[in-house]
């Protein structure tokens, strides 16, 4: 029998159900700076090896991240950037996206707030013989160490959900993009299917949601040691982009699971993987009702050719 959780434990355990190593050391791919942001960086620093392993794990959480990287690279290739283009990986984490872009002939500037992640990216670049194509450094996403109009493309995977001020980050990313440059990033979906089906998180069940709101911030999941992740709607993302002088070009939702009940994983891993694969195929095919309820959004935005950014 499952052990009943105290309210404070409930707030923590959802992130553990979604990410098997979150309770131990939740990692975050972010480059940041308020008090909450600093706690995120500290945890991220301690979880560098876990974020390296996630791209080879054979479970739902691993498959979602592997699919995220695959879709990201496919979208980048479709942009048709010239060989040798200088691109930004903001919140590079373990460096997997940086490596993939370098392998495709791009010159990558990789930044992250966590020194251990930067070291891991540098190690991977050296091991792959890509030192000349990847420059990795510790830097904050709120104040990037680049002049304006530096890049035709900026990539930021797994960063926005962990930021206290996503607007400031997106505005700063826009600043370093060239006019008509692209920003490719992810955000967590507030209306993900896994949450809609769990009565403890479903917005359709107002009384239970009111109870959950006593232990969670609205639109946030508070994880271990007070770390919060933030979920957004596409309308909110569009507002962030518009304020930063950008517009959304395309988006998809992806990632189905792990499914939970009362913040506990509800399906055996092998069944969860099959459910994810089936639902992801439907979402990729644009199936109504499924295409918009994945766990994350992958979003491609383009900077306006006008240099003005709304204040």
Descriptions of predicted regions:
Residues 94-143:
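Class I SAM-dependent methyltransferase SAM/SAH-binding core
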Residues 6-82, 84-93, 100, 120, 182-213:
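Conserved class I S-adenosyl-L-methionine
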Residues 158-159:
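Short catalytic micro-motifs in class I SAM-dependent methyltransferases
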Residues 167-179:
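A short glycine-rich, Lys/Arg-flanked "PGG" loop and its adjoining helix->strand segment in the class I
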Residues 229, 235-239, 249-311:
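A C-terminal cap/extension of S-adenosyl-L-methionine-dependent methyltransferases
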Residues 155:
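A conserved beta-strand element that flanks and buttresses the S-adenosyl-L-methionine
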């Amino acid at each position: 029998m499952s052990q009943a959780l105290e309210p404070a434990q409930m707030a923590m355990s959802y992130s553990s159900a979604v990410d098997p190593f979150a309770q131990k050391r939740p990692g975050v791919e972010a480059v940041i700076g308020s008090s909450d942001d600093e706690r995120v960086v500290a945890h991220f620093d301690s979880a560098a090896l876990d974020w390296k392993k996630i791209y080879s794990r054979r479970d739902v959480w691993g498959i979602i991240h592997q699919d995220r990287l695959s879709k990201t690279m496919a979208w980048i290739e479709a942009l048709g950037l010239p060989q040798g283009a200088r691109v930004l990986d903001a919140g590079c984490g373990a460096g997997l996206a940086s490596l993939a872009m370098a392998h495709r002939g791009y010159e990558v500037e990789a930044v992250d707030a966590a020194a251990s992640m930067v070291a891991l990216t540098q190690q991977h670049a050296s091991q792959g013989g890509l030192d000349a194509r990847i420059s990795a450094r510790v830097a904050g996403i709120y104040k990037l160490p680049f002049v304006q109009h530096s890049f035709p493309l900026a990539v930021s995977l797994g960063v926005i959900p962990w930021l206290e001020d996503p607007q400031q980050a997106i505005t700063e990313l826009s600043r370093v993009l060239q006019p008509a440059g692209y920003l490719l990033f992810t955000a967590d979906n507030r209306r993900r299917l896994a949450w809609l089906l769990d009565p403890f998180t479903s917005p359709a069940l107002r009384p239970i949601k009111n109870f959950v709101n006593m232990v969670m911030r609205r639109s946030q999941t508070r994880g271990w040691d007070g770390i919060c992740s933030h979920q957004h709607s596409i309308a909110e993302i569009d507002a962030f982009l518009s304020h930063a002088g950008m517009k959304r070009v395309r988006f998809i939702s992806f990632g189905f699971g792990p499914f939970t009940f009362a913040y506990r994983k509800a399906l055996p891993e092998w069944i969860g993987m099959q459910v994810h694969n089936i639902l992801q195929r439907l979402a990729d095919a644009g199936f109504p009702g499924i295409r918009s309820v994945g766990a994350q959004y992958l979003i491609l935005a383009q900077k306006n050719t006008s240099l003005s950014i709304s204040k």
